[in-house]
Swiss-Prot record:
Keywords: Allosteric enzyme, ATP-binding, Cytoplasm, Kinase, Nucleotide-binding, Pyrimidine biosynthesis, Transferase. It catalyses: UMP + ATP = UDP + ADP. It comes from Staphylococcus saprophyticus subsp. saprophyticus (strain ATCC 15305 / DSM 20229 / NCIMB 8711 / NCTC 7292 / S-41). Residues 21-26 are annotated as: Involved in allosteric activation by GTP. This is Uridylate kinase. GO terms for cellular component: cytoplasm. It comes from the Bacteria.
Length: 240
């Protein structure tokens, strides 16, 4: 009997650090293969999946800005880093015979398709994995904001936030504070009021205004993406 997912269409947000694993920099081949296998498994269900990848494993725009670079230039470099990650993930997925398309907000026709909302939706309807790269194409906006915006544009049911080495949202950093409390459920307004570092405030406000749920969980545990898609209670669920 075919397994039925809880959601019809999801957006998976991966941080760049998640692709680096314990290496801290670059792309760990074992990690990206594991993530690709999990995404490919979800693609076989009755669920459409789009992926947004960060670029922090290669470059952070804010870091460059803090070191004296022009913020716009530093952010554009970060957008290019996300394209590198997207192409690496696409390659891993295609090795698993999973039909994949990379759509970039900055036009680079030789390596990817330009982002067009209707085209992205059509790819999803054809059960292709869609990877969004290059942020929203403008500096000063994070890939968290990209995830929120793209989720609204393609009418996704939820944003799945795969975190590196943390299994949900806590009241404080569990690595620093042993008394930190893990939340099973939060509202967007709670997240903003308590200053919980799930995503930046621009992305959080956008999700709240557009009623986009978030499910925050550990990406390092095998099978968690599928568990989240199937509706298992993992990590922290954030709703309006």
């Amino acid at each position: 009997m075919a397994q039925t997912s809880k959601y019809e269409r999801v957006v998976l947000k991966l941080s760049g650090e998640a692709l680096a694993g314990d290496d801290g920099f670059g792309i760990n081949p074992i990690i990206i293969k594991s993530i690709a296998e999990q995404v490919a498994e979800v693609a076989k269900l009755d669920c459409e999946i789009a992926v947004i990848v960060g670029g922090g494993n290669i470059w952070r725009g804010k870091t460059g800005s803090d070191l004296g670079m022009d913020r716009g230039t530093a952010d554009y470099m970060g957008m290019l880093a996300t394209v590198m990650n997207a192409l690496a993930l696409q390659d891993s997925l295609e090795q698993l015979e999973c039909d994949t398309r990379v759509l970039t907000s900055i036009e680079m026709k030789q390596v990817a398709e330009p982002y067009i909302r209707r085209r992205a939706i059509r790819h999803l309807e054809k059960n292709r994995v869609v990877i969004f790269a290059a942020g929203i194409g403008n500096p000063y906006f994070s890939t968290d904001t990209t995830a929120a915006l793209r989720a609204a544009e393609v009418e996704a049911d939820v944003i799945l936030m795969g975190k590196n080495n943390v299994d949900g949202v806590y009241s404080a950093d569990p690595k620093v504070d042993p008394n930190a409390i893990k939340y099973e459920h939060l509202t967007h307004i709670q997240m903003l009021q308590e200053g919980l570092q799930v995503m930046d405030s621009t992305a959080s406000s956008f999700c709240m205004d557009n009623n986009i749920p978030l499910n925050v969980f550990s990406i390092t545990e095998e099978g968690n993406i599928k568990r989240a898609v199937m509706g298992e209670k993992i990590g922290t669920l954030i709703t309006k």
